[in-house]
């Protein structure tokens, strides 16, 4: 109560004060009074409260609330006042005010002009000038040359490691050797030390010699005994008379260094075939001959029944002493000494491999030929230049090897024989022009392969067969007859089934049983198919494979009985006669006459190739017992090897098992079968075919499709009449071979038995040319003869043509069957090797000693710049690159060399230093042709040097006349691009990263290569194919030798080998793909990340120097602008360009990297998935179609890539000419309608514009609309007038011109163009021509169209660029340097006025003016100042144009557009129609002349190839 009283007193005092104050204030101002009253009241209340209420009481919160209410009321009051009083008052005052502005017209116009200028500036320089603000994208610089230093310099190793390295390097010539074979060959090896100057008579050395350390000079006895040569080496001192009786002179052949063999390929074949006896033909008039008694004929001479033909076999070798008596006597003496040698005694246990029957001998006169000596090194001596260590493998080691491991021996002989043909014969034939000697050997070997049919098939039976063919010929007509008529074979289906589908099963089963037999040492077969006798060939061979399938155990028992006693079975033949007692047929009544022909023909074939069946079938040796396993075999099968030479599987090109070549050693592998039984078993493999006169059965340079046995008629062995030594080394890219498989299919497929169809003289291309030039006959094959023997057995290309001289009936055995026989029976290969060694002329023998087979690894340097020129190199397979050092420290690629090309002739002949450094891009096989051999041949056979002189002269002429090499020295793109894509033999397809469908890509590329690829086909390899062929051990240490040889054989067989890296990164197969490739294709998905992939990092780690190409795979035929630049930005090693390919593929839904567990990315991914699912049902379905789909297969992207890899690209070069260039559009349309694919496009001026449109869209429809739109802009005079400026540098600013081009191309870069494209400009800052292949397309196309005076130059990296037509208006030479095979060049430039002028030594301008307007003046008008300047500017272009017209492979086109001016863009439709009409007429003429490279015609030509087309006619 006391507090309340105090409060009341306080309130009363406050009210009294307030009342007095209010009264005073009201009198002054009522408004202020109200506010003051409120303030005083508040203060009074607060004062009273503070006096009454103590601190920290609840009344303090009441004060705060009152203060807040006061503030809120103040704000509400202000807002209400603003919206109800202040704002309406302000608006009322504004709208009620009236303003009057007064100005004159000038001010108004100026204001409007300023406003328009501002808008114009914004539009002109901010919107329309967008092209000038693009981010800078300079041209991509050409990548530097990859030349990595050698990992191992020559001569660094020493001691024991060096010894083994040199030894292994020398025996590489044998191919791969398994551990037991290697041990057997080297366990009796001897070494010998030679001091400097010591001479070794190799003629007395019976073995294989090689240099381990040091250097040896190889000399040959000179054939010019009576003549002295000042330059040839001579041993005339008294100390050396013992080695040179009668002062014999010697010629230096070669120098042998570390790791090289002293023995030649001929020597090795001689060592392997010492015990093989030669046999003669079997005529009707006499039984089979045998070697005559001593004194009658020299041992080893081939016998000839036709004495009158002996003169034809004499080889025409200048200076070769074939008839010297003392030489003959010395050869006979050496032969006798050999028979008494202890080595001969050791061979007594060797199973007989004789090819001669044991009937009484009939003495015959020997055929004159090369002296047959028993030495493996005839007329050869060696002299050590320094202290030298040599190793000798004696001949006894080779004889033991034949006895123990005959299958391995056959493979080694096959390798040596193949290299002998590739190295010696091919070099002599192609490079030295020794076609006569090689053809003489072909002719002589025919006499050893004649086997006559039995008499009962020569008379009425042969007439009935010819009558069948005659009736069929009349029925089907002459056109079909040209392809051949085959006798119907009712058992063909059974043959194909037994040979293809069931062969693998039987081989695997037989192999497993054989392994069981070896391990358990028990009889191998106890099942229904058990082998009754160990005399039979081993299971899985040719006989067992087919007979087990056809006849079961009964027929096998019969076969075994026949094999053990073949002669009684012959006597039971009802067709046998005393005259032909060696031929017999089966007595089954169901055997008809056609089967008789097949069986007899096949038996004659087998006897001709060496399967006589007279060898010891059951030799008395432990090797014939199946219960005995040799020591080497027990070691090899006892577990992993304990030496560096691990046990390896066999090289079997047709089996998929992994049987070792040594596994057959215990049973002599191949007891020579009875040819009658083998023929009976394989009679369904042979075809009886009729060919009319003039048919070409085998063409020079192609692989033989099989063996031809002449039944009736005559075959002619010919060579082209103009030059008998065509280039067989390079013929693989020109001539169709006998293997049409483009996918590496099994050789025993359904088409393996089809006989090849002949090429007639009226066929396409080369056949027409040959028919016109004619052929030169070398020999005649009569009935009973064999054609294609050497080429078929050795699987090498033919040196000759085989042509039907008359209507001929032949028996044809396909190559697949021959290969199986050769693989199973080594005697076939040994027989041919023996025949070749016996018939080899002395000149070829000495060349064989001098030539060296060299194998180099990837990156290895053969010689360096400045080295002495010691040898010429010939490339067998692989790839080499020649580079030269530049002054700035870089390297410039001069050339690349592929298969069949030669390097270094000019330096060797001029004895000058090397002009560059030569290194191997990949593993390469070479022939080293030493300078010493050239000097020796030049002295004894000067005519040989003519061939090499012609090669050098032709090469220098091509170098001088090649316009592509002129003016390109300072160009950013090197001239080596011309050789970079030519003669490619291997291509590897690698993904950029995992997940790229390289297998599908490879399949599509192979499909394209089969249509437009090399004539001899292409094959595709992946890891599965390699493992299927070589087994699971294909990639180990020793397996690499086997693999490299197999890959080399494929390169020799096919024109292109495609490797597909379908494995992980760090696998041996991926490494093999990179090391074996001439060109690497990195395939990436364009929509994926452009980061460097793991495969690329792996390749960079391997330091590959091969050509590298980037292939971007798109879902649609369109590339987003700038996408390609992102891919190329970090890949400076891409030095072969890039390709855009359209291929539908399914993207990999499984992420390559494991997803992270962060919340953000996971949520984002989930939202994207939900959005995609929702849009699937809610959005309108958009039909995704490519921007352009090719209407013909040959225009597809894979065909374009295939043509580029094969060097068959078609280029289109468009010239400049202003509005006349509209005709380009019409010509392109005509080319598309004619079916001509365009792979590369180049242009100048208006040609650069039209070419850029076509390169971007690859279709004529879009370029027609865009070109017409641009022509409309250029025809507008208003745009031209608005672009005028003060003519300091040009009459226009160039803006409108830039806008027109930019609106056409946008931000697209040249790298984004679908086709490969370039344009040229004239760099007036550096006075040179420049070619542009990267950067913004609109800039360089605009620069190429910048006519001086009309448009200003375009600035690019400080240089000023003008129209490229000032230097070269038709860039054919540039297109040729890029590797185009066929070039279509369209010229639309103006023609110069060549009217003769005679206005005198001085000229009055006034007279010239009136003369121009005087219609009666007869004096021609002098040129104006502008015309003189224009002609001066195009002076160099005229010369380039004339060279382009004569460029090989260039098709020059010039439509009739001379009536149209440079600026007549308004006549678009008219000029377009002129070009289209001209293109149609011109291409129609080319089609009629047969010049037009139509794809349809190419396919038709391939359809006529006898190795590809199916059989058309069959009786």
Swiss-Prot record:
PROSITE patterns: CNMP_BINDING_3 (PS50042), PNPLA (PS51635), UPF0028 (PS01237). Residues 543-554, 566-579 have a biased composition (Polar residues). SUPFAM superfamilies: cAMP-binding domain-like (SSF51206), FabD/lysophospholipase-like (SSF52151). The active site is at 1245 (nucleophile), 1363 (proton acceptor). The chain crosses the membrane at residues 60-80, 103-123. It catalyses: a 1-acyl-sn-glycero-3-phosphocholine + H2O = sn-glycerol 3-phosphocholine + a fatty acid + H(+). InterPro entries: Acyl_Trfase/lysoPLipase (IPR016035), cNMP-bd_dom (IPR000595), cNMP-bd_dom_sf (IPR018490), LysoPLipase_patatin_CS (IPR001423), NTE (IPR050301), NTE1_P-loop_dom (IPR056556), PNPLA_dom (IPR002641), RmlC-like_jellyroll (IPR014710). Residues 1212-1376 form the PNPLA domain. GO terms for molecular function: lysophospholipase activity. A motif (GXSXG) lies at residues 1243-1247. A nucleoside 3',5'-cyclic phosphate 2 binds at residues 835-955. It is found in: Endoplasmic reticulum membrane. It holds the Pfam family Patatin. Keywords: Endoplasmic reticulum, Hydrolase, Lipid degradation, Lipid metabolism, Membrane, Repeat, Transmembrane, Transmembrane helix. It is an enzyme of class 3 (hydrolase). GO terms for biological process: phosphatidylcholine catabolic process; regulation of phospholipid biosynthetic process. A motif (GXGXXG) lies at residues 1216-1221. PANTHER family: NEUROPATHY TARGET ESTERASE SWS, NEUROPATHY TARGET ESTERASE/SWISS CHEESE D.MELANOGASTER. Intracellular phospholipase B that catalyzes the double deacylation of phosphatidylcholine (PC) to glycerophosphocholine (GroPCho). Plays an important role in membrane lipid homeostasis. Responsible for the rapid PC turnover in response to inositol, elevated temperatures, or when choline is present in the growth medium. This is Lysophospholipase nte1. It comes from Neurospora crassa (strain ATCC 24698 / 74-OR23-1A / CBS 708.71 / DSM 1257 / FGSC 987). The lineage of its organism: Eukaryota, Fungi, Dikarya, Ascomycota, Pezizomycotina.
């Amino acid at each position: 109560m006391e507090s309340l009283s105090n409060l009341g007193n306080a309130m009363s005092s406050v009210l009294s004060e307030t009342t007095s104050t209010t009264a005073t204030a009201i009198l002054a101002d009522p408004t202020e009074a109200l506010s003051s009253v409120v303030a005083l009241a508040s203060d009074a209340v607060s004062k009273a409260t503070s006096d009454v209420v103590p601190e920290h009481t609840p009344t303090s919160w009441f004060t705060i609330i009152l203060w807040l209410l006061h503030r809120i009321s103040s704000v509400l009051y202000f807002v209400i006042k603003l919206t109800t009083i202040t704002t309406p008052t302000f608006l009322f005052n504004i709208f009620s005010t009236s303003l009057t502005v007064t100005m004159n017209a000038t001010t108004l116009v100026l204001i409007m002009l300023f406003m328009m200028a501002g808008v114009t500036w914004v539009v002109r320089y901010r919107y329309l000038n967008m092209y000038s603000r693009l981010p800078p994208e300079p041209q991509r610089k050409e990548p530097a040359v990859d030349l990595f230093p050698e990992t191992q310099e020559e001569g660094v190793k020493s001691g024991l490691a060096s010894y083994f390295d040199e030894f292994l390097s020398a025996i590489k010539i044998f191919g791969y050797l398994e551990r037991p074979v290697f041990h057997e060959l080297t366990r009796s090896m001897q070494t010998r030390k030679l001091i400097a100057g010591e001479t070794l008579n190799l003629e007395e050395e019976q073995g294989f010699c090689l240099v381990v350390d040091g250097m040896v000079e190889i000399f040959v006895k000179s054939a010019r005994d009576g003549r002295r040569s000042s330059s040839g080496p001579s041993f005339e001192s008294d100390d050396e008379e013992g080695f040179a009786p009668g002062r014999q002179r010697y010629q230096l052949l070669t120098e042998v260094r570390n790791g090289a063999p002293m023995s030649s390929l001929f020597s090795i074949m001689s060592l392997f075939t010492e015990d093989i006896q030669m046999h003669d033909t079997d005529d009707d008039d006499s039984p089979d001959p045998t070697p005559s008694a001593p004194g009658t004929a020299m041992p080893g001479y081939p016998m000839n029944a036709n004495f009158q033909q002996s003169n034809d076999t004499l080889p025409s070798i200048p200076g070769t002493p074939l008839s010297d008596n003392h030489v003959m006597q010395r050869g006979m003496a050496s032969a006798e000494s050999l028979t008494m040698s202890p080595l001969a005694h050791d061979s007594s246990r060797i199973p007989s491999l004789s090819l001669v029957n044991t009937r009484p001998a009939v003495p015959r006169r020997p055929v004159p030929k090369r002296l047959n000596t028993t030495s493996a090194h005839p007329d050869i001596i060696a002299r050590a230049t320094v202290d030298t260590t040599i190793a000798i493998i004696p001949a006894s080691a080779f004889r033991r090897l034949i006895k123990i491991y005959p299958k391995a021996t056959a493979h080694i002989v096959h390798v040596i024989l193949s290299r002998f043909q590739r190295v010696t014969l091919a070099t002599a034939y192609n490079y030295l022009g020794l076609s006569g000697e090689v053809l003489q050997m072909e002719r002589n070997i025919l006499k050893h392969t004649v086997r006559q049919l039995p008499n009962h098939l020569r008379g009425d039976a042969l007439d009935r067969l010819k009558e069948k063919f005659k009736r069929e010929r009349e029925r089907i007509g002459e056109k079909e007859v040209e392809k051949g008529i085959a006798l119907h074979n009712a058992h063909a289906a059974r043959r194909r089934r037994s040979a293809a589908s069931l062969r693998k099963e039987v081989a695997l089963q037989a192999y497993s049983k054989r392994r069981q037999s070896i391990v358990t040492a028990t009889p191998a077969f106890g099942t229904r198919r058990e082998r009754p006798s160990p005399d039979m060939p081993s299971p899985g061979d040719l006989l067992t494979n087919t007979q087990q399938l056809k006849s079961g155990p009964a027929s096998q028992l019969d076969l075994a009985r026949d094999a053990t006693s073949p002669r009684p079975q012959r006597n039971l033949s009802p067709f046998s006669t005393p005259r032909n007692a060696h031929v017999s047929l089966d007595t089954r009544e169901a055997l008809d006459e056609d089967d008789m022909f097949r069986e007899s023909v096949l038996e004659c074939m087998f006897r001709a190739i060496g399967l006589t069946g007279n060898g010891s079938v059951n030799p008395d040796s432990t090797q014939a017992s199946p219960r005995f396993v040799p020591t080497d075999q027990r070691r090899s099968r006892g577990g992993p090897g304990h030496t560096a030479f691990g046990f390896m599987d066999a090289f079997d090109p047709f089996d998929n098992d992994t049987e070792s070549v040594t596994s057959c050693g215990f049973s002599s592998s191949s007891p020579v079968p009875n040819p009658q039984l083998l023929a009976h078993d394989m009679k369904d493999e042979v075809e009886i075919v009729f060919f009319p006169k003039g048919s070409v059965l085998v063409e020079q340079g192609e692989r033989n499709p099989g063996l031809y046995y002449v039944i009736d008629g005559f075959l002619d062995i010919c060579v082209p009449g103009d030059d008998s030594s065509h280039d067989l080394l390079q013929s693989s890219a020109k001539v169709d071979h006998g293997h049409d498989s483009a996918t590496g299919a099994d050789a025993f497929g359904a088409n393996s038995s089809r006989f090849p169809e002949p090429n007639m003289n009226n066929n396409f291309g080369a056949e027409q040319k040959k028919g016109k030039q004619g052929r030169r006959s070398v020999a005649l094959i009569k009935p009973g003869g064999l054609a294609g023997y050497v080429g078929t057995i050795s699987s090498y290309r033919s040196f000759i043509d085989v042509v039907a001289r008359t209507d001929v009936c032949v028996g044809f055995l396909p190559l697949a069957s021959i290969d199986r026989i050769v693989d199973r029976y080594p005697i076939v290969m040994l027989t041919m090797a023996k025949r070749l060694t016996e018939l080899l002329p002395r000149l070829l023998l000495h060349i064989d000693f001098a030539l060296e087979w060299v194998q180099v690894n990837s990156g290895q340097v053969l010689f360096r710049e400045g080295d002495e020129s010691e040898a010429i190199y010939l490339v067998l397979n692989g790839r080499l690159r020649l580079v030269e050092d530049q002054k700035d420290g870089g390297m410039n690629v001069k050339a690349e060399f592929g298969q069949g090309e030669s390097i270094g002739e000019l330096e060797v002949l001029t004895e000058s230093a090397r002009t560059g450094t030569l290194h191997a891009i990949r593993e390469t096989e070479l022939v080293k042709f030493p300078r010493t051999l050239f000097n020796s041949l030049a002295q004894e056979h000067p005519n040989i040097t003519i061939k090499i002189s012609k090669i050098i002269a032709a090469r220098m002429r091509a170098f001088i006349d090649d316009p592509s090499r002129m003016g390109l020295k300072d160009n950013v793109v090197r001239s080596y691009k011309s050789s970079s894509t030519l003669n490619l033999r291997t291509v590897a397809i690698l993904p950029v990263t995992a997940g790229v469908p390289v297998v599908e890509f490879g399949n599509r590329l192979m499909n394209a290569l089969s249509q437009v690829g090399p004539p001899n086909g292409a094959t595709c390899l992946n890891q599965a194919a390699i493992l299927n062929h070589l087994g699971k051990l294909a990639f180990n240490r020793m397996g690499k030798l086997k693999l490299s040889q197999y890959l080399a054989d494929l390169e020799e067989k096919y024109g292109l080998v495609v490797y597909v890296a379908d494995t992980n990164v760090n696998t041996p197969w991926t490494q093999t793909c990179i090391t074996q490739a001439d060109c690497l294709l990195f395939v990436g998905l364009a929509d994926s990340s452009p980061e460097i992939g793991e495969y690329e990092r792996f390749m960079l780690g391997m330091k590959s120097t091969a050509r590298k190409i980037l292939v971007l795979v798109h879902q649609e035929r369109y590339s987003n602008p700038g996408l390609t630049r992102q891919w190329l930005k970090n890949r400076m090693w891409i030095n072969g360009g890039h390709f855009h390919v359209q291929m539908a593929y399914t993207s990999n839904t499984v992420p390559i990297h494991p997803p992270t567990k962060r919340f953000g990315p996971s949520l984002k991914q989930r939202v994207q998935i939900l959005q995609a699912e929702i849009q699937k049902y809610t959005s309108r379905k958009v039909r995704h179609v490519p921007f352009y789909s090719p209407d013909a297969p040959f225009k597809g992207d894979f065909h374009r890539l295939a043509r580029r890899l094969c060097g068959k690209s078609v280029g289109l070069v468009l010239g400049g000419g202003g509005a006349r260039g509209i005709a380009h559009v019409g010509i392109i349309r005509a080319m598309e309608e004619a079916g001509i694919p365009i792979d590369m496009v180049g242009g100048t001026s208006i040609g650069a514009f039209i070419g850029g449109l076509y390169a971007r869209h690859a279709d004529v429809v879009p370029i027609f609309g865009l070109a017409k739109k641009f022509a409309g802009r250029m025809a507008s005079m208003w745009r031209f007038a608005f672009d005028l400026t003060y003519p300091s540098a040009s009459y226009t600013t160039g803006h409108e011109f830039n806008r027109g081009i930019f609106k056409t191309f946008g931000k697209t870069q040249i790298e984004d163009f679908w086709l490969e494209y370039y344009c040229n400009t004239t760099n007036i800052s550096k006075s040179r021509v420049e070619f542009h292949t990267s950067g913004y397309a609109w800039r360089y196309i605009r620069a190429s169209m910048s006519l001086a005076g009309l448009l200003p130059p375009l600035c690019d990296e400080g240089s000023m660029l003008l129209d490229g037509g000032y230097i070269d208006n038709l860039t054919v030479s540039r297109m040729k340097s890029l590797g185009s095979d066929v070039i279509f060049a369209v010229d639309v430039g103006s023609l110069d006025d060549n009217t003769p002028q005679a206005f005198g030594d001085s000229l009055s301008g006034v007279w010239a003016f009136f003369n121009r307007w005087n219609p009666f003046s007869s004096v021609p008008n002098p040129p104006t100042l502008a015309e003189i300047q224009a002609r001066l500017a195009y002076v160099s272009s005229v010369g380039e144009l004339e060279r382009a017209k004569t460029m090989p492979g260039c098709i020059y086109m010039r439509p009739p557009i001379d009536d149209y001016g440079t600026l007549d863009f308004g006549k678009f439709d008219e000029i377009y129609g002129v070009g289209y009409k001209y293109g149609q007429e011109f291409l129609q003429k080319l089609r009629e002349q047969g010049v037009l490279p139509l794809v349809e015609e190419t396919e038709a030509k391939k359809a006529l190839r006898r190795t590809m087309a199916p059989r058309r006619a069959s009786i």
